[in-house]
Amino acid sequence: MPIAQIHILEGRSDEQKETLIREVSEAISRSLDAPLTSVRVIITEMAKGHFGIGGELASKVRR
């Protein structure tokens, strides 16, 4: 069972996350010739104050 773990900054809509899960699952299924029903996707959302970009908090870099 392939498992993809994706870390993203908070703020995406449920629709965007659903699209991400669907498209990642389809890509994994295709590339590994695995049944789509066996693919798992875990999304971990991070607060912008808990992630750094270029030495700065993401909350300061991305508004």
UniProtKB/Swiss-Prot annotation:
One of its GO terms (molecular function) is isomerase activity. Its EC number is 5.3.2.6. Keywords: Aromatic hydrocarbons catabolism, Isomerase, Plasmid. Belongs to the 4-oxalocrotonate tautomerase family. Catalyzes the ketonization of 2-hydroxymuconate stereoselectively to yield 2-oxo-3-hexenedioate. Signal peptide: none annotated. It holds the Pfam family Tautomerase. SUPFAM superfamilies: Tautomerase/MIF (SSF55331). PANTHER family: 2-HYDROXYMUCONATE TAUTOMERASE, TAUTOMERASE-RELATED. The active site is at P2. It catalyses: (2Z,4E)-2-hydroxyhexa-2,4-dienedioate = (3E)-2-oxohex-3-enedioate. This is 2-hydroxymuconate tautomerase. InterPro entries: 4-OT, 4-OT-like_dom, Tautomerase/MIF_sf. GO terms for biological process: toluene catabolic process; xylene catabolic process. The keyword ATP-binding does not apply. It comes from Pseudomonas putida (Arthrobacter siderocapsulatus). It comes from the Bacteria. Homohexamer. Pathway: Xenobiotic degradation; toluene degradation; Xenobiotic degradation; xylene degradation.
